[in-house]
Amino acid sequence: MLWFKNLMVYRLSREISLRAEEMEKQLASMAFTPCGSQDMAKMGWVPPMGSHSDALTHVANGQIVICARKEEKILPSPVIKQALEAKIAKLEAEQARKLKKTEKDSLKDEVLHSLLPRAFSRFSQTMMWIDTVNGLIMVDCASAKKAEDTLALLRKSLGSLPVVPLSMENPIELTLTEWVRSGSAAQGFQLLDEAELKSLLEDGGVIRAKKQDLTSEEITNHIEAGKVVTKLALDWQQRIQFVMCDDGSLKRLKFCDELRDQNEDIDREDFALRFDADFILMTGELAALIQNLIEGLGGEAQR
């Protein structure tokens, strides 16, 4: 099981049918296929269990996991520039005149098409967890852009996907700032030794503290000077450590060894059974963490 490293969390804004049996057919229409000779990028669904299963969905306890794969052709700018300049120089010499901008733009397209079949490919995979019990969708990535791209693929596959980023009633950065100021986080959470503070003023500066006592006078002075905490490293019940961000995302998830080893009694040769057990364990823990976070941050914004 690929234990999630990050969480971009989204709320389903209205009820829709999300059943694995239906989704299996819907995702199949957008299954991943490699780039053709003239494709810059392709994205589609692959089995979350990799070569161990052909299924595009895996479901347990009302939780569904799916996996998107993306192939991108790598064409470094210097390579394009060099090929384009050579082509322009050749034509200008042959025609004894300077080419117009529109002609150069057209040549650039030709150069791209000629280079694409020889370009290297970069592959990436993004796991998505759908919590049908709590009406949440979690994407395992660190950037909103990547999460939105994956959600867009799911939306295209299903025909509709009404989701909004999970948001709190109170600004997250103000709650995090109060936790650091008081030296005490919400019940179940403990401050660790890392934070990022930003000034509310434009061009007011950013402070990144690592391996530092966040209750120290130095940090307090930054807060008194008007900075707010935009990222804060936290421990949840000595089970999961993570960095809480002011956009509602959770970064650098780290599950304790006791948790990760909980299913060690299952034979690793039985990949499907271990994957299922780890998935149930991980989603159960993260669902509880997210619920605790929502409560600790003052509750979810009313829709």
Swiss-Prot record:
This is Recombination-associated protein RdgC. Pfam families: RdgC (PF04381). GO terms for biological process: DNA recombination; regulation of DNA recombination. May be involved in recombination. Belongs to the RdgC family. The keyword Cytoplasm applies. Keywords: Cytoplasm, DNA recombination. GO terms for cellular component: bacterial nucleoid; cytoplasm. It is found in: Cytoplasm, Nucleoid. GO terms for molecular function: double-stranded DNA binding. The gene is rdgC.
